[in-house]
């Protein structure tokens, strides 16, 4: 028996188990211990350890504790019999061992918790008890054979039988018995449970080991030292069991509960059975039956006290038993038993609470492992023990055989019963009384069996157990797909889930084919986990080890089913996991959901890439790098859905989201394949959507509702086929999408409406785009409907609001059910609002935001593979950023949303770009669509004519119809507005729908949509559609409004009110009101504001676009505009959205009265064309500014979220900022570099593009991201020269540079500038000389460029300093501004207060410095951080109070003030400030700098540049004041963006104004990017303007 001391050695293992177990219970106790303690304790100590455990139990630990108990036990026995009260138990507990005593208390406390979780507790306990019983059986045999514990198990059969009835009857009795009732009987009951283990100890301790064991068991139950004796072995098992239990609990808490019950119930029969089992166990301890019986009462008292205090003695008994089971193994580690007793006990209670999970896994193990016969289990058990993962499965099975011998056959069979009471009924066959115990017995026995090699269990049990396990464990927690992302938690959680899902198949199969499981476990390093866990190890391993074995993949694939990998897993599983056909099939079943999402194509593709996809799916699932890898081939337009769906599935859980957050951040970091990235983005989005659980769910509803709409929309769009990737538009496509929606869980369904409604766009995208992206984007768009792609991103946050609103509204809007969609949008927005409020309000929000953002953005990033921008955009848009994506999508929708299809095409074009750099996705969403739309759409829209109609809208918008709708038909917005927009609106809304009109249809959708669609889609679409759009404001806003340029303002307003699309920003009160009005604004605004907005939006943007740079405005502006509006619309929406729900936002809103009561002003200003468009943005921004405190935190959170996927967020900002650039932003970051070269050399290109509107258009499409960023910037500067061109292009250029680098965000954003020195150069390319003040860039770069590049700052600063250039621009821009000012002046004036840029333009013409200064402190102080918003607010403020000076001042000073601090100082200022997020946005977006430091850039090209450029800008600023000053400092970013003063000013206002102004649009893009984008990114950038952006981006 000294081996028992050795057992103590095992104790180390057990101890590990114990701590692990402790840890395990915390989350998934089973997970960690399974690998570590379980493996060591169980596999190594499988037979010996058990023996050791048993011996240690009996001898070392047990004798001492036992002696204590023994000494006490006689009295306790006498007393205990009498004293069922906890006192007896407690004294024993305390007397036995202080540690256990405390544990007893702990246990009791936990038990109380457990009692609360009693059903689960019962399962858990029973499981544990069963395990313990199994161990007892094992130990009885083991005890006889210290070495051949398992082989000795045969003696266990009698005890097994006894235990069986013992468990059975008492199990039922315990289950039925009230805690107190059970307390009295269960004093014994508890004893029996322990006697179960006692038999183990009894054989170990011949003298009174029974009693000692009983006390040990009692102590264990009670937390007494005696427990350690059972605890040691049991704990080993328990560690194993705990891990298994964890898995089991995940899969089937019932089993454990039953097990606990079964184990507990034995109390009534314990003495007789104990005696009987004792003799059996007693082989050595046959004499101890009585001792055991005696033991029983004392132990029972212990248990009773535990149980009684525990509320449910049963639960407690079960718990103690469970603990004992758990601790039994650990008790093999004598010291550990006690330690374990304490921890174990605590864990056990935890298990009661958390062991549900543990117990479930335990159950799983118990159930699962039952399969193998005891004897078989013996060798296998040893193996399994070595291979802990398998151990449970096999061991249990082995245990079954032994149990059969022991007579726990019933138990083995009963395990299923724990799974279902039916098993208990089934148990009766073995014994009428034992049936419940049989049910529970099998659980414990299998559990113990794995430890003790419970071969005694009959194989019959094994089979049943196996089936039961499969049943109970497998399907239970499929949602754990989440866990996939969560590698650690995910391990247990996902494993359990996978096990649950796959466990049935796999479990069954594994039971049959344990070897593969074993392998898989070894591969998965989760060797510790038994097969049910085995699958988990595979998944875990696969997650952890990127390249899990294919074999593992089969089992591990189950996760994949959750993800796209699921489908791949289906194929791969089928291909690879042929052996595990069932598992595979199950996965396929699981894939059924995804598969619909997938087209058959996806499956085919996956089938083709079974191996690749298996791996890739795994990777995809994990990093979605695989998505990037795999999607190329696999990812057909239909595939992205599947990929996204997989993430959607994953996003089913926030865990996934969380994991995605860091996993995507990490694994997907770069968002390399637009595919994988888009994919990830979608998944993340979906996750994010799931993150917004309510949102997703509502979306689901919409999905259902939208489908009809979608069907129409789809049909309407004429991309029905693609939309429902499977040709069936509504039926197939929808179902697919719907399924995916389902998969998305909540998101997809809603997305489906959006997807379908939006799906028309999505499908359109998918179909029209037909490109990998289209599906992705379409699915991000259409799937935006799914909110996974877009809706997930935009509609996630926005999907709830805008996306669904926009997507639904758009899709529905076009589908003809805008109202319903609007409802949904509102609902969604409400959800979104609520969610965001939660995010903002709760620290959770940090995680959520981070996750959402991270997931969203990283996902965006990964979704955007190369460019998370759109995904990020989508993601940001998704939740708060949803606004951005909205913006992005809106820019996209404006550019793309306006041509949702266009956006889709943009996406699609961006798909290339997007795949190249999903920024296109953001762009696609926000900017790429515009850019991509312009450029990609131009490029791709051709590819996707329908979207082209839409996507081409921007591009085609040269066919202003769709394109203007994209930006409200910017100039055409008027005609395009009314005319093109209806078409465009349809297309746009549709496209927008597709694009989501992203901002349009997303949270902003209503807002931006309203602004955009309503602005210009609504006028035309709003006019025709917008009314409905108005009615369905979100639809209008999103669909129709989205089209409107005015809606962009509306969107801004909406954004500011954030709702407008959902009114959910209503909290914004004013803005909500205004935004709600934005809804109205979109609606109201659609009519009035719409007109206003049309004027503002259309005029602002269109005017600016049309007037300022009709041509470039049409295209480049559209892109800029879209991004502007998109960015701003989105961002404000995001910012405002969040702000809206944030009281601070309201507070700030008041503070930002200057912002025109962002909401009020937004809406009002929206209403007033002046305030309307520009102010909507200003409001939005201002609102953001206002809400900056709240928004700052919100945005900060969001930005952090984005920050989490900083690059993505930034990227999407990039995207938004430079739609095309945005596209390049991520994947194209190189492209950006390329374009950066362009940007650098874009002077040339920009000159051409900037000079020529066509060039600009080239830039506009910004294929030339450089073209846009460079071209935009350069063009802007050149356009500064060209006035109109410079006007637009500079912005795009900065946008491009800004957002080009945006992938870097900090870097890319600036890298676009900085990294893209070209940006500084190119951004300043047109004005590299102009931007010569690149030195300022250094300081400027210090802001956002600091990390990325002084150059960018320089470039930006250059732009700011560019004031010379900016002046040039201003000079040019004034002309440029003049067209814009024409409409900008009118528009700007119209929304001059709102449109600081307008005022900026006009006011810019005024002494911006004064304004700047005037507003600067205020702006800075008030909006300091909210510079963007402040700029917007100040834009508003400056517009309102000073107009330009106010604006400029804050901008200028803000720049110096914010900027000088540099990114950090500036970030802190705005960071600290309400504008911090915004400023960070501005800052974080170089555009932020530009915007924030539009004046900043100009004045604070450097902090000194602040003044110097400010001066420079001022002198030039005054002349160029409107453009240069504003652009210079008003929009240094814009200036930097080469946005020319106006763009610069517009940049800041652009957020509001530039973003609204076509002229500023150039800026607007950057400004928007800088402003709204910056605003949004600002927080992201703000946290790490450079770092995060740069880092995240990179």
Swiss-Prot record:
One GO biological process term: cell differentiation
Residues modified to N6-acetyllysine: 79
Phosphothreonine PTM positions: 1394
Gene name linked to the record: Ahdc1
Any one GO molecular function term: promoter-enhancer loop anchoring activity
DNA-binding region location: 395-407, 541-553
Cross-link for Glycyl lysine isopeptide (Lys-Gly) (interchain with G-Cter in SUMO2), residue positions: 606, 1402
Biased composition regions of type Basic residues, renumbered to the chain: 391-401, 734-743
Annotated stretches, region: Disordered: 19-111, 149-241, 256-307, 367-464, 578-604, 714-789, 942-967, 1152-1191, 1245-1306, 1495-1525
Residues annotated with Omega-N-methylarginine modification: 887
Function recorded in the entry: Transcription factor required for the proper patterning of the epidermis, which plays a key role in early epithelial morphogenesis. Directly binds promoter and enhancer regions and acts by maintaining local enhancer-promoter chromatin architecture. Interacts with many sequence-specific zinc-finger transcription factors and methyl-CpG-binding proteins to regulate the expression of mesoderm genes that wire surface ectoderm stratification.
Biased composition (Acidic residues): 228-240
Primary location: nucleus
Post-translational modification Phosphoserine, affected residues: 267, 593, 825, 842, 892, 1060, 1180, 1315, 1317, 1392, 1396, 1498, 1540
Biased composition (Polar residues): 165-177
Record's compositionally biased regions (Low complexity): 272-303, 1153-1168, 1180-1191, 1245-1264
Native source species: Mus musculus
Domain of life of the source: Eukaryota
Protein name per the record: Transcription factor Gibbin
């Amino acid at each position: 028996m000294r081996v028992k001391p050795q057992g103590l050695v095992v104790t180390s293992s057990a101890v590990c188990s114990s701590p692990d177990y402790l840890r395990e219970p915390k989350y998934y106790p089973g997970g960690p211990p399974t690998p570590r303690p379980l493996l060591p304790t169980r596999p190594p100590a499988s037979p010996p350890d058990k023996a050791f455990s048993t011996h240690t139990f009996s001898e070392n630990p047990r004798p001492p504790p036992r002696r204590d108990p023994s000494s006490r036990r006689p009295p306790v026995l006498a007393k205990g019999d009498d004293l069922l009260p906890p006192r007896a138990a407690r004294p024993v507990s305390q007397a036995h061992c202080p540690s256990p005593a405390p544990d007893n208390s702990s246990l009791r406390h936990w038990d109380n918790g457990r009692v609360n979780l009693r059903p689960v507790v019962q399962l858990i306990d029973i499981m544990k008890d069963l395990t313990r019983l199994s161990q007892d059986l094992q130990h009885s045999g083991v005890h006889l054979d210290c070495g051949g514990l398992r082989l000795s198990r045969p003696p266990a059969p009698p005890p097994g039988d006894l235990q069986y009835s013992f468990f059975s009857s008492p199990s039922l009795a315990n289950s039925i018995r009230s805690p107190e009732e059970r307390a009295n009987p269960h004093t014994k009951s508890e004893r029996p449970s322990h006697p179960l283990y006692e038999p183990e100890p009894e054989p170990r301790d011949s003298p009174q080991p029974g009693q000692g064991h009983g006390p040990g068991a009692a102590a264990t139950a009670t937390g007494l030292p005696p427990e350690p004796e059972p605890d040691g072995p049991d704990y080993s098992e328990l560690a194993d069991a705990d891990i298994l239990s964890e898995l089991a609990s995940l899969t089937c808490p019932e089993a454990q509960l039953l097990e606990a019950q079964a184990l507990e119930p034995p109390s009534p029969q314990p003495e007789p059975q104990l005696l009987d089992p004792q003799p059996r166990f007693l082989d050595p301890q046959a004499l101890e039956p009585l001792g055991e019986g005696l033991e029983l009462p004392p132990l029972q008292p212990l248990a009773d006290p535990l149980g009684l205090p525990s509320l449910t003695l049963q639960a407690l008994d079960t718990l103690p038993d469970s603990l004992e089971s758990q601790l039994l193994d650990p008790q093999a580690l004598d010291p550990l038993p006690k330690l374990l007793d304490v921890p174990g006990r605590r864990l056990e209670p935890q298990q009661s609470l958390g062991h549900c999970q543990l117990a479930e896994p335990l159950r799983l193990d118990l159930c699962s492992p039952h399969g193998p016969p005891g004897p078989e289990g013996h060798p296998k058990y040893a193996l399994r023990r070595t291979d802990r993962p398998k151990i449970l499965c096999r061991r249990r099975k082995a245990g079954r055989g032994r149990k059969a011998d022991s007579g726990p056959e019933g138990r083995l069979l009963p395990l299923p019963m724990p799974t279902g009471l039916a098993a208990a009924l089934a148990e009766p066959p073995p014994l009428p009384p034992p049936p419940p115990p049989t049910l529970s017995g099998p659980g414990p026995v299998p559990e113990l069996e794995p430890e003790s090699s419970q071969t005694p269990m009959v194989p019959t049990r094994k089979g049943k157990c196996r089936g039961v396990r499969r049943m109970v464990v497998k399907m239970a927690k499929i949602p754990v797909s989440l866990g996939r992302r969560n590698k650690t938690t995910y391990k247990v959680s996902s494993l359990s889930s996978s096990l649950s899902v796959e466990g049935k198949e796999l479990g069954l199969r594994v039971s049959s084919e344990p070897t593969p499981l074993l392998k898989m476990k070894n591969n998965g390093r989760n060797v510790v986990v038994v097969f049910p866990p085995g699958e988990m190890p595979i998944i875990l391993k696969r997650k952890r080890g990127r390249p899990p074995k294919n074999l593992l993949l089969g089992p591990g694939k189950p996760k994949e089913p959750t993800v796209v990998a699921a489908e791949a897993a289906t194929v791969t599983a089928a291909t690879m996991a042929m052996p595990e056909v069932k598992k595979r099939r199950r996965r396929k079943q699981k894939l059924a959901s995804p598969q619909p999402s997938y087209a058959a194509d996806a499956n085919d593709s996956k089938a083709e890439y079974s191996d690749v996809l298996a791996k890739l799916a795994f990777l995809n699932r994990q990093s979605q790098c695989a998505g990037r890898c795999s999607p190329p081939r696999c990812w057909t337009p239909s595939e992205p859905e599947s990929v996204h769906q997989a993430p959607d599935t994953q996003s089913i859980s926030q865990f996934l989201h969380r994991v995605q957050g860091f996993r995507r951040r990490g694994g997907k970091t770069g968002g390399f394949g637009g595919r994988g990235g888009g994919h990830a983005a979608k998944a993340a989005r979906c996750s994010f959507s799931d993150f917004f659980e309510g949102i997703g769910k509502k979306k689901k509803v919409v999905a259902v509702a939208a489908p009809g709409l979608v069907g129409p929309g789809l049909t309407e769009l004429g991309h029905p086929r693609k939309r429902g990737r499977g040709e069936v538009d509504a039926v197939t496509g929808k179902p697919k999408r719907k399924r995916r929606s389902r998969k998305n869980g909540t998101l997809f369904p809603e997305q489906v409406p959006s997807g379908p409604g939006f799906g028309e766009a999505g499908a359109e995208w998918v179909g029209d785009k037909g490109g990998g992206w289209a599906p992705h984007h379409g699915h991000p768009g259409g799937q935006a409907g799914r909110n996974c792609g877009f809706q997930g991103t935009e509609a996630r946050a926005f999907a709830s609001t805008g996306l669904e609103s926009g997507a639904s509204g758009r899709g529905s809007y076009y589908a003809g059910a805008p109202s319903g969609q609007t409802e949904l949008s509102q609902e969604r927005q409400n959800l979104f609002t609520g969610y965001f409020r939660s995010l903002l309000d709760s620290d959770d929000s940090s995680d959520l935001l981070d996750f959402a953002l991270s997931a969203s953005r990283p996902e965006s990033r990964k979704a955007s593979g190369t460019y998370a921008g759109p995904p990020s955009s989508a993601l940001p848009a998704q939740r708060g950023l949803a606004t951005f994506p909205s913006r992005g999508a809106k820019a996209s929708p404006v550019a793309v949303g306006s041509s949702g299809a266009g956006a889709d095409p943009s996406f699609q074009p961006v798909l290339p770009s997007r795949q190249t750099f999903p920024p296109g996705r953001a762009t696609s969403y926000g900017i790429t669509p515009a850019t991509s739309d312009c450029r990609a759409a131009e490029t791709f829209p051709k590819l996707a004519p329908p979207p082209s109609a839409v996507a081409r809208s921007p591009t085609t918008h040269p066919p202003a119809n769709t394109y203007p709708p994209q930006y409200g038909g910017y100039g055409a917005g008027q005609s395009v507005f009314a005319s093109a927009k209806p078409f465009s609106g349809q297309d746009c809304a549709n496209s927008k729908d597709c694009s989501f009109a992203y901002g349009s249809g997303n949270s902003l959708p209503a807002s931006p949509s309203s602004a955009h669609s309503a602005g210009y889609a609504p006028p035309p679409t709003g006019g025709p559609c917008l009314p409905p759009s108005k009615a369905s404001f979100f639809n209008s806003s999103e669909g129709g409004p989205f089209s409107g340029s005015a809606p962009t303002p509306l969107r801004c307003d909406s954004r500011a009110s954030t709702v407008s699309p959902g009114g959910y920003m209503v909290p914004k009160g004013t803005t909500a009101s205004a935004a709600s009005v934005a809804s109205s604004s979109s609606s109201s605004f659609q009519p009035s504001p719409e007109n206003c907005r049309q004027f503002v939006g259309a005029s602002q943007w269109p005017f600016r676009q049309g007037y300022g740079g009709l041509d470039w405005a049409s295209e480049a502006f559209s892109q800029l505009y879209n991004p502007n509006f998109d960015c701003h619309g989105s961002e404000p929406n995001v910012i405002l959205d969040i702000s809206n729900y944030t009281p601070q936002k309201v507070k700030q809103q008041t503070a930002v009265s200057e912002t025109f009561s962002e909401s009020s002003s937004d809406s009002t200003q929206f209403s007033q064309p002046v305030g309307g468009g520009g102010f909507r943005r200003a409001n939005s921004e201002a609102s953001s500014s206002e809400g900056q405190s709240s928004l700052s935190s919100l945005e900060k959170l969001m930005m952090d979220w984005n920050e989490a996927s900083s690059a993505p967020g930034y990227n999407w900002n990039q995207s938004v900022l430079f739609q095309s650039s945005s596209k390049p932003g991520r994947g194209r970051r190189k492209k950006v570099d390329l374009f950066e070269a362009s940007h650098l050399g874009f002077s040339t290109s920009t000159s051409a593009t900037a000079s020529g509107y066509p060039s600009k258009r080239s830039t506009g499409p910004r294929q030339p991201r450089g073209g846009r960023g460079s071209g935009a910037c350069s063009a802007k500067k050149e356009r500064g020269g060209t006035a109109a061109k410079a006007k637009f292009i500079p912005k795009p250029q900065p946008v491009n540079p800004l957002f080009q680098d945006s992938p870097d965000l900090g870097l890319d954003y600036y890298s676009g500038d900085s990294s893209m020195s070209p940006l500084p150069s190119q951004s300043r390319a047109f004005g590299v000389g102009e931007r010569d003040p690149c030195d300022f860039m250094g300081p400027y770069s210090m802001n956002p460029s600091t990390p990325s590049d002084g150059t960018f700052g320089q470039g930006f600063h250059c732009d700011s300093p560019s004031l010379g250039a900016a002046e040039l621009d201003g000079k040019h821009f004034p002309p440029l501004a003049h067209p814009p000012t024409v409409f900008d002046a009118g528009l700007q004036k119209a929304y001059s207060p709102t449109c600081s840029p307008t005022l900026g333009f006009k006011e810019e013409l005024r002494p911006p410095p004064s304004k700047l200064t005037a507003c600067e402190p205020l702006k800075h102080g008030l909006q300091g951080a909210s510079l963007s918003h402040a700029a917007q607010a100040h834009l508003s403020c400056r517009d309102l109070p000073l107009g330009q000076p106010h604006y400029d001042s804050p901008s200028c000073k803000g720049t110096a003030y914010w900027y000088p601090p540099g990114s950090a100082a500036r970030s802190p200022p705005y960071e600290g400030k309400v504008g911090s997020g915004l400023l960070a946005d501005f800052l974080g977006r170089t555009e932020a700098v530009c915007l924030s430091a539009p004046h900043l850039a100009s004045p604070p090209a450097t902090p000194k540049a602040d003044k110097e450029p400010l001066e420079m800008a001022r002198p030039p600023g005054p002349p160029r004041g409107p453009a240069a000053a504003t652009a210079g400092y008003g929009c240094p970013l814009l200036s930097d963006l080469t946005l020319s003063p106006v763009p610069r000013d517009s940049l800041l206002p652009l957020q509001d104004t530039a973003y609204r102004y076509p002229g500023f649009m150039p800026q607007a893009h950057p400004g928007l990017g800088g402003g709204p984008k910056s605003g949004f990114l600002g927080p992201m950038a703000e946290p790490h303007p450079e770092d995060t952006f740069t880092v995240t981006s990179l």
